[in-house]
A protein has these predicted regions:
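Bacterial N-terminal signal peptides
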Residues: 1-5
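Sec/Tat signal peptide C-region and signal peptidase I cleavage site
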Residues: 9-11
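Compact, glycine-rich, soluble single-domain proteins
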Residues: 13-158
């Protein structure tokens, strides 16, 4: 009985520390490969969008995004990658990274697009090879700016 009480307190403490345990759930894009990265010491679980179908879908349709979750879009070569907020249900930050994984452009607190025909396409003036979508406010909370190097761990997890 005492063991169960101690165990419950430990479990509750772990759940409160979202950086350790509270990913959306095993259902956070189960069909996607995943990777974990560290951004300024903060661990983030990323679903990898590496096919055209996955890149088109992005985070659309997801109900929410926890602070320690995001999506990494992988492209074969650097180019000007445009993104929009069609069918999104929450605001996000978008970071464009070059082939050296340095942030080259940031769009913050992008709101969902309500009217399909009026959706703005966000396209930086510089080429990028990777694009990160993270919870709105993440870039400010973790002091990310142009030139920040994101250590991408492209060894995939399932």
């Amino acid at each position: 009985m005492i063991f169960a009480i101690i165990s419950s307190k430990s479990y509750a403490s772990e759940l409160q520390d979202s950086n350790k345990t509270s990913y959306n759930s095993p259902d956070f894009y189960p069909q996607y490969k995943k990777t974990s990265i560290s951004i300024n010491g903060f661990k983030v679980l990323l679903a990898l969008a590496s096919t055209d179908e996955q890149r088109i879908k992005g985070l659309s349709g997801l109900e929410k995004l926890n602070e320690n979750e995001g999506m990494l879009f992988l492209f074969d070569r650097p180019s000007k990658q445009g993104f929009w907020m069609n069918e999104m249900k929450f605001p996000i930050d978008i970071l464009w990274l070059d082939s050296d994984s340095r942030v080259v452009h940031i769009e913050k607190n992008l709101e969902p697009c309500i009217i399909f025909m009026a959706c703005h396409v966000y396209t930086p003036q510089v080429d990028s090879q990777y694009v990160l979508e993270l919870r709105s406010g993440f870039t400010n909370d973790h002091s990310i700016q142009n030139g920040t190097r994101i250590n991408l761990n492209l060894t995939q997890e399932n």
